[in-house]
Curated annotation (Swiss-Prot):
Family: Belongs to the OXA1/ALB3/YidC family. Type 1 subfamily.
Residues covered by region (Disordered): 43-70
CDD domains xrefs: 5TM_YidC_Alb3, EcYidC-like_peri
Name of the protein in question: Membrane protein insertase YidC
Record text on subunit structure and interactions: Interacts with the Sec translocase complex via SecD. Specifically interacts with transmembrane segments of nascent integral membrane proteins during membrane integration.
Gene3D superfamilies (UniProt xref): 2.70.98.90
Recorded name of the encoding gene: yidC
GO cellular component: plasma membrane
Residue stretches of biased makeup (Low complexity): 58-68
Gene Ontology BP terms: protein insertion into membrane; protein transport
Residues spanning the membrane: 7-27, 346-366, 415-435, 495-515
Length: 536
């Protein structure tokens, strides 16, 4: 809910800014003021064959030869990340991204998606009938660390036993993706047929930077074709419990995520926030194992950045993790356009400016009609005022006379409002697109203040540290307001006068990329209004 408040504020402000005077004139209204030990087998493919070549794996020990081994750490190193597992259960201890740092400062640490606090809640742990196997089972590990340099895939096989059930966890790693695939094989070792509940866990601490009001960590899941989320406050109070139909679920912020996706269809999903750790569970409610036989269960884990191109190539509907709200159909092409312009400009700030110019050109005809209608309405204000004075006690007659006046002069009272309102979905789509574009994270525009070494717009996903752009944006709004026909009513005029101040304070902590968009849009609007005034 907290992440939607800025959007609601912008929408309400825009409606007040654009529509109040037209709606009040149209209706004849009088204006009113104003959220143990383990088993794993590690094998790496080293041949010069293509990646599609089968991965060589060591066979797991037979059930009769199972012997627990001493627990240790198992490291998986790929070009994209470094992961450290505990052989006691195959749970994650660390997961560090190699291409992303915590800040833009030199020597900043790499982004850690599984911290020691989260590791204490057993991320990628296996639950058998609700019991933590990483604590209660005996585990065997026979293998080495994995180092994948792009020439092949690799696997880890963790084997454990508990309560007459042997579980073999095979984790598959691809050096070109953040997706980790797992196949769990359950085998009866006690000669008893049984039904078991198999659950997989995933844990992480907050993925958002401290003080990131527009980049909140939340729990999310994909169910019945819809992306759904819940805030940290709701998680603390009630948690999340979805009884069926979840394709994937986990934790995410604007730029990173850690989610699980069952391979064999949608399953129940649960999530809680306790002690600063987000913990989610996907559980298969009933898995049948015949006496002496086996059953299998598959799941995928995506722990990494929300890069649109990577997610589009992923299974399990993971591309739906990029959620832009109601205006997704606008946000996605706008973000694609942003990346296209960046491929030529080499600077995301410049790409935002080019995209803003393009959007402005597309809406140029609508803006022309709006400005023209506003000018016509301004000319009719004296006559409208006379009608109000004459029929002030008879609202119905007054409205009829006002409408007759508009009809006589062929003026549409909504003509200045509607073209502007049509642009609001585009603004909101671009707002969400820029807010969730990981491409803008740590992307510089003007890295230093001109003629100085002072760091300025070195990160378009962060606020302007000196508030220069939001203040200039407020000034452009004030100038734009001066060029716009003023409302006839003094109360309306006062409301409009304060709008630049409201917007300036609202944009002070907005990501710089969003402020640059709105600033450039204002400058272009001023240019268009000036041109219209000269033409008229």
């Amino acid at each position: 809910m907290e992440n939607k408040r800025p959007i609601i504020a912008v929408v309400l402000s825009l409606f007040v800014l654009i529509g109040w005077s037209y709606l009040s004139e149209f209706m004849g209204w009088t204006p009113a003021p104003a959220p143990v030990e383990q088993n794993a087998t590690a094998v790496q493919q080293k041949a010069s064959e293509p990646v599609a070549q089968p991965v060589q794996t060591a066979s797991a020990p037979a059930a009769s030869s199972f012997a627990p081994t001493e627990g240790r750490e198992v490291k998986v190193d790929t070009p994209l990340y470094t992961a450290v597992f505990q052989s006691q259960g195959g749970v994650l201890k660390h997961f560090r991204l190699k291409k992303y740092t915590e800040s833009i400062e030199e020597g900043a640490p790499l982004v850690e998606l599984v911290t020691p606090e989260a590791a204490g809640k057993a991320p990628m742990g296996l639950l058998l009938n609700g019991q933590p196997t990483w604590k209660l089972a005996a585990w065997q590990f026979e293998g080495d660390d994995l180092k994948l340099d792009g020439s092949g895939k690799g696997e880890l096989v963790f084997v454990g036993e508990m309560d007459g059930v042997r579980f073999e966890r095979t984790l598959s790693f691809d050096p070109e993706t953040y997706l980790i695939s797992e196949k769990v094989r359950l085998t009866d070792t006690a000669g008893v047929s049984r039904d078991v509940r198999l659950g997989m866990t995933l844990s992480t601490t907050s993925l958002s930077p401290e003080g990131g009001a527009y980049n909140l960590t939340r729990m999310a899941w994909y169910q019945d074709g819809f992306h759904q989320e819940t805030s940290a406050d709701d998680l603390r109070e009630t948690g999340v419990k979805v009884d069926e139909g979840v394709n994937w679920g986990g934790v995410m912020c604007n730029y990173f995520m850690a989610v699980m996706a069952p391979a064999e269809g949608a399953l129940p999903f649960k999530g809680v926030l306790e002690g600063g750790v987000y913990r989610s569970v996907v559980e298969n409610s009933s898995l049948s194992i015949a006496s002496g036989s086996s059953a299998e269960f598959g799941i995928g884990y995506y722990i990494g950045p929300k890069e649109s191109d990577r997610l589009a190539a992923m299974p399990y509907h993971l591309d739906e993790a990029l959620n832009y709200g109601w205006f997704t159909f606008l946000a996605k092409p706008l973000v694609s356009g942003l990346k296209f312009f960046y491929s030529y400009a080499g600077n995301y700030g410049v790409a935002i400016i080019i995209l803003t110019i393009l959007v402005k050109l597309l809406f140029w005809p609508l803006s022309q009609k709006s400005y023209k209608s506003m000018e016509q309405m301004k000319k009719l204000q004296p006559m409208v005022q006379k009608i109000k004075e004459k029929y002030g006690d008879d609202r119905q007659r007054m409205n009829q006379e006002v409408m007759e006046l508009y009809k006589t002069y062929k003026v549409n009272p909504a003509g200045g409002c509607l073209p502007m309102l049509l642009q609001i979905p585009v603004f909101l789509g671009l707002y969400q697109g820029l807010l969730n574009a990981i491409e803008l994270r740590h992307a510089p525009f003007i890295a230093h203040l001109p003629f100085t070494d002072i760091v300025w717009l070195a990160d378009l996903s962060a606020k302007d540290p000196f508030y220069i752009t939001p203040v200039v944006m407020g000034a452009t709004m004030l100038l734009q307001q001066r060029l716009t026909p003023a409302p006839a009513d003094p109360t309306q005029a006062k409301i409009m006068m304060f709008m630049p101040v409201v917007f300036t304070f609202m944009f002070l902590n907005f990501p710089a990329g969003l402020v640059v968009y709105w600033l450039v849009n204002n400058v272009l609007s001023i240019g268009q209004q000036w041109w219209m005034l000269r033409k008229s």
